[in-house]
Amino acid sequence: MIESTLPALALWGVIGYLLGSIPFGMVLAKVMGLGNLRDIGSGNIGATNVLRTGNKLAAALTLVLDGGKGVVAVLAARAAGGEDLAQIAGLMAMIGHCYPVWLRFAGGKGVATFLGIVLALAFPVGVGCCLAWLAGAFATRISSMGALVASVAAVPLAFLLGFPGAVVLLILLGALIFWRHRGNIARIRTGTEPKIGQKK
């Protein structure tokens, strides 16, 4: 097992970032002949925008694979050296998804990757966040609202369910979710945010 030394933290930070940087939405859209996601809907590379192509399978695969990046980063780092490495790998996987080197640092909004990270880091909290996402999204039919609700719910859920050690990371991840959704928040306020399944 690798101890949580600075070199180990740096190594798993890089591994997490590179995992997070894999643009599964872009790859699937190209392989499945759906076009360039940058020219579709919001131009985002995540599952919500893939759904705007009309291909539900591609959207579901994007959701699972983007979430899987977070799961793999956290579990692999934990197996190598414990919770410190798991948290840094998870944080960097999120940053990699949002700012991937392969796409000139213009990536997705991190919702699926966030949920994957939390599920792997603290499973009960992750389940609660998934339920919060579903509640927010289906109550409003706005995907971004579900993301915001889930990110806000994460910290109190961590305290309630006995995972206080994850709180700092969850605050950082939540702040990144809000930052990446700042345009969505502005549209929610003006009532112009697209509904789930609606072309932007």
From Swiss-Prot:
Annotated TM spans: 8-28, 57-77, 88-108, 114-134, 159-179
Major subcellular location class: membrane
Listed GO biological process terms: phospholipid biosynthetic process
EC nos: 2.3.1.275
InterPro entries on file: G3P_acylTferase_PlsY
Protein's UniProt keywords contain Nucleus: no
Family affiliation: Belongs to the PlsY family.
Protein name: Glycerol-3-phosphate acyltransferase
Gene (UniProt): plsY
